[in-house]
């Protein structure tokens, strides 16, 4: 199964709403057998346990982007997703 990177808004307007949206899209694509999703929004839980500077998370995201077969940009403004 191909690996899909899902990018989109995280903090604006509400992190919980945005994380929920990204997870739901990922679930649908996975359950249809289309992609194995990588959802960087879920690092919010990791960050709650081990806070790191934003550059740390961007570095992790860039490594994952190199390995993904496809990229999906969710609608909405996002400085990080558009970087």
Each model region followed by its residue ranges:
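Catalytic phosphate/metal-binding cores of nucleic-acid and nucleotide-processing enzymes, i.e., regions
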Residues: 1-83
């Amino acid at each position: 199964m191909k690996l899909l990177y899902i990018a989109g808004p995280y903090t604006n307007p509400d992190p919980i709403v945005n994380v929920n949206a990204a997870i739901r899209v990922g679930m649908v694509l996975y359950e249809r057998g289309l992609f194995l999703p990588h959802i960087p929004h879920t690092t919010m839980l990791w960050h709650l346990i081990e806070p790191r500077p934003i550059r740390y998370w961007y570095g992790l995201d860039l490594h994952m982007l190199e390995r993904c077969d496809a990229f999906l940009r969710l609608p909405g403004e996002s400085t990080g997703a558009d970087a």
